[in-house]
């Protein structure tokens, strides 16, 4: 893959492998939504995924209170961090000498959480130079840059050695790639017995085809949401054997219903809520072992 020099913190940025990758890089380089940044400001963990769990209405208090919006933002952030913790619960036994990979790492919040939890190295890949620079700057602020690193990289063609990674994950980033290509790459760099975990939204084959709500989500994020069936088929074709599948749809709906009442709405909340309610869209965790 060809590279080009830049003057940013990231010394060399691989050129996009396809025009679509260039589109996605531009999308996330320009993204600065308050719903991501203001939530991250709560405790310095900047996420690019959604939340799970019951809303703590006692912590929110009275909507008429002048501090209510601040409390709502903190509650949304708590639910997003709970989602990341739930993903990490499924990574298996991880030692301090291991290396993990976050494929589609965003601004790096989950990477920081993984290092704090396991004491290991965490490598993140993203198409966005601005995200990588943000994540690396945050790691330096926390003085964990020797253990947590983001890089601009095509997640379908990573620099990691074959069999060198103990566990890896995609957290809401699989809808930007071909699943067979993605799982072939995870299978390549994971050690035998290594763990792969994804949390993702997928359209429900029982609905028949992607609903109008799913189509709206695709258009909003410039992505291509896959069906649940496609995940399982592509994993099986690439020596990743699923052993845990958790339907998180009921657990994420309260997050969306709360977010829809905040000042941070982006206009896509209704599509998520309606598609979860009508069964056309599902939010799932899948954990698989490399064999």
Swiss-Prot record:
Enzyme Commission designation: 2.1.1.255
Entry keyword annotation includes Methyltransferase: yes
EC class name: transferase
UniProt cross-references to InterPro entries, sorted A to Z: Erg6_SMT_methyltransf, GPPMT_Stmyces, SAM-dependent_MTases_sf
A molecular-function term among this protein's GO annotations: S-adenosyl-L-methionine binding
CDD domains referenced in this protein's UniProt entry, alphabetically: AdoMet_MTases
UniProt entry keywords in alphabetical sequence: Magnesium, Methyltransferase, S-adenosyl-L-methionine, Transferase
GO biological process: methylation; terpene metabolic process
Cofactor: Mg(2+)
UniProt keyword Transcription regulation present: no
Any Pfam family: CMAS
Recorded catalytic activity of this chain's protein: (2E)-geranyl diphosphate + S-adenosyl-L-methionine = (E)-2-methylgeranyl diphosphate + S-adenosyl-L-homocysteine + H(+)
NCBIfam families, per database record: GPPMT_Stmyces
Biological role: Catalyzes the SAM-dependent methylation of geranyl diphosphate (GPP) to yield (E)-2-methylgeranyl diphosphate (2-MeGPP).
Family (UniProt): Belongs to the geranyl diphosphate 2-C-methyltransferase family.
Protein name: Geranyl diphosphate 2-C-methyltransferase
The species this protein was found in: Streptomyces ambofaciens (strain ATCC 23877 / 3486 / DSM 40053 / JCM 4204 / NBRC 12836 / NRRL B-2516)
């Amino acid at each position: 893959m060809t590279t080009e020099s830049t003057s940013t913190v990231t010394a060399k940025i691989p050129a996009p492998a396809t025009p679509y990758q260039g589109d996605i890089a531009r999308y996330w380089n320009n993204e600065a939504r308050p719903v991501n940044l203001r939530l991250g400001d709560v405790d310095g963990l900047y996420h690019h995924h959604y939340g799970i769990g019951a809303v703590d209405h006692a912590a929110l208090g009275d909507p008429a209170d002048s501090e209510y919006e601040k409390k709502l933002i903190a509650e949304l952030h708590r639910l997003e961090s709970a989602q990341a913790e739930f993903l990490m619960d499924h990574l298996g036994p991880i030692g301090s000498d291991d290396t993990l990979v976050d494929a589609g790492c965003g601004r790096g919040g989950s990477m920081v959480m993984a290092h704090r939890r396991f004491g290991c190295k965490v490598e993140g890949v993203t198409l966005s130079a601005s995200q990588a620079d943000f994540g690396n700057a945050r790691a330096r602020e926390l003085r964990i840059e020797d253990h947590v690193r983001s890089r601009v990289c095509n997640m379908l063609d990573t620099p990691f050695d074959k069999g060198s990674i103990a566990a890896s994950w995609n957290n809401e980033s699989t809808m930007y790639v071909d699943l067979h290509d993605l799982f072939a790459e995870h299978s390549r760099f994971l050690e035998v017995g290594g763990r792969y975990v994804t949390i993702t939204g997928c359209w429900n084959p029982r609905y028949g085809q992607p609903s109008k709500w799913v189509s709206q989500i695709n258009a909003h994020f410039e992505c291509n949401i896959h069906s649940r069936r496609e995940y399982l088929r592509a994993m099986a074709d690439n020596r990743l054997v699923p052993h845990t599948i958790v339907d998180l749809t009921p657990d994420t709906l309260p997050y969306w219903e709360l977010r829809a009442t905040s000042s941070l709405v982006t206009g896509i909340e209704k599509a998520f809520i309606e598609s979860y309610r009508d069964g056309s869209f599902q939010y799932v965790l899948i954990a698989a072992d490399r064999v």
